[in-house]
């Protein structure tokens, strides 16, 4: 079975690469993103819209309300193995994402050592200026998406349930938006009515939070097996 693995830090174009590869191969994309398993966080987690998918198929490891919390890495890994097994007869899958904990589960599991031909695309972290330009553009799009709720509207809606607030505080983007509101002594719904200067500061702050996360991803990701090549058969990370 052919597995095409696309991974790297946030804001490095993994989803676009996956969509292009899905168009080329006809294979579905399975998201290796635990936060994207919550549809209530669609915009803030970077779930691509129907238009962005361009007719390709995208699968998620779960479909859960936020009140259940973010799916644990171990459970996500079990779901991942199950999905790969289910699609074995279809000839292949594209795996795309950047969950440190999920990729580490893969690196520590012998399941990935046999019966797979690996095609690995590793997206690297760009220099700070390039990254920030891309991240700011992404945040602007999240504030005014072509479809669905904005990241702030998602936050406002979910903030109404106090039991969800601790979960939101653990997620990039939402966390900084809450901090920004607190620092400026405004309520979360007032984030929907910021003037241009304040909005620019919010955008910059969220992008900075993404940069911090991207640097952590770059440091913590498991290393690709030194023996790997296109069509390589063996463990993609050499096991840790």
Swiss-Prot record:
InterPro entries: P-loop_NTPase, Tzs. Its EC number is 2.5.1.27. It comes from the Bacteria. The keyword Transferase applies. It is an enzyme of class 2 (transferase). Keywords: Crown gall tumor, Cytokinin biosynthesis, Plasmid, Transferase. Gene3D superfamilies: Crystal structure of tRNA isopentenylpyrophosphate transferase (bh2366) domain, P-loop containing nucleotide triphosphate hydrolases. Pfam families: IPT (PF01745). GO terms for biological process: cytokinin biosynthetic process. It catalyses: dimethylallyl diphosphate + AMP = N(6)-(dimethylallyl)adenosine 5'-phosphate + diphosphate. One of its GO terms (molecular function) is AMP dimethylallyltransferase activity. Belongs to the isopentenyl transferase family. Transfers dimethylallyl groups to AMP as part of the biosynthesis of cytokinin phytohormones. This is Adenylate dimethylallyltransferase.
